[in-house]
C-alpha cells in the first residue's frame, strides 16, 4: 500500500486539531503529483465542511502543497489579480487511503501577490497551546518552521516560485477538460 496518493486520484483533505477533533474537510482535490515526500493537489469550487457542520465552497482554483517532513502546508489561490498564498503551520501529512490528513496548529502566514506576508492567528495559537497542552517540543518545531517558511517566501522557493504555480496550474487545468 503506497504511503501517498497516486496522480489523478480525487481525494479528501482532513484537517484535525491537536486534541484529535476534526477541524475542516475539503471534499475533492485532484492529486497532481504524489511521492513519499510530498503531495501536490489542485481544486476549484470544492465543498468544505467545518467542524460545526457548516459548509462553504472555495471561490477560486487552488494548488495545494503538502510535505511529509516540513511542519507546514501551502495553498496557492489563483485569482484575477495574482497568486495569493495561505500557509498553515501544521504537522507533516499522512495518507491512509481515506484522506490526506494533518494537524492544524493555528498559526498561518498569508502571502500577497507582491510577496509581502503577514503572520496570522498568534492569539489563537497561544490559547490553543495552553488549552490543548501543546508540548514544548511542538512549540519549538512550529516556531522554527515559521522561520523556514518565511525563508522560502523571501527566496521564492518551492511553491513560491512563479514557475511552480504555472506548471502545476497547467497540469490541474488538463484534468479539468
Swiss-Prot record:
The keyword Hydrolase applies. It catalyses: a ribonucleoside 5'-triphosphate + H2O = a ribonucleoside 5'-diphosphate + phosphate + H(+); a ribonucleoside 5'-diphosphate + H2O = a ribonucleoside 5'-phosphate + phosphate + H(+). Pfam families: DUF402. Mg(2+) 2 binds at residues 106, 108, 121, 124. GO terms for molecular function: magnesium ion binding; nucleoside diphosphate phosphatase activity; ribonucleoside triphosphate phosphatase activity. Keywords: Hydrolase, Magnesium, Metal-binding. Its cofactor is Mg(2+). The active site is at residue 24. It is an enzyme of class 3 (hydrolase). InterPro entries: DUF402, FomD-like_sf, Ntdp-like, SA1684. Mg(2+) 1 binds at residues 88, 104, 108. Its EC number is 3.6.1.15, 3.6.1.6. Has nucleoside phosphatase activity towards nucleoside triphosphates and nucleoside diphosphates. Belongs to the Ntdp family. This is Nucleoside triphosphate/diphosphate phosphatase. It comes from Geobacillus kaustophilus (strain HTA426).
Amino acid at each position: 500500500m503506497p504511503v501517498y496518493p497516486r496522480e489523478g486520484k480525487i481525494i479528501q483533505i482532513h484537517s484535525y486539531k491537536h486534541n484529535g477533533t476534526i477541524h475542516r474537510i475539503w471534499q475533492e482535490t485532484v492529486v497532481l503529483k504524489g511521492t513519499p515526500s510530498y503531495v501536490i493537489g489542485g481544486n476549484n469550487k470544492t465543498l468544505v465542511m467545518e467542524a460545526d457542520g457548516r459548509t462553504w465552497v472555495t471561490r477560486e482554483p487552488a494548488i495545494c502543497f503538502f510535505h511529509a517532513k516540513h511542519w507546514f502546508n501551502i495553498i496557492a489561490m489563483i485569482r484575477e489579480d495574482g497568486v495569493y498564498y495561505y500557509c498553515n503551520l501544521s504537522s507533516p501529512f499522512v495518507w491512509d487511503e481515506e484522506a490526506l490528513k494533518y494537524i492544524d496548529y493555528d498559526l498561518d502566514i498569508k502571502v500577497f501577490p507582491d510577496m509581502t506576508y503577514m503572520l496570522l492567528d498568534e492569539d489563537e495559537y497561544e490559547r490553543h497551546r495552553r488549552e490543548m497542552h501543546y508540548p514544548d517540543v511542538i512549540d519549538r518545531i512550529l516556531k522554527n518552521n515559521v522561520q523556514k517558511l518565511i525563508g522560502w517566501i523571501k527566496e521564492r522557493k518551492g511553491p513560491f516560485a512563479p514557475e511552480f504555480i504555472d506548471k502545476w496550474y497547467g497540469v490541474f487545468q488538463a484534468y479539468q477538460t
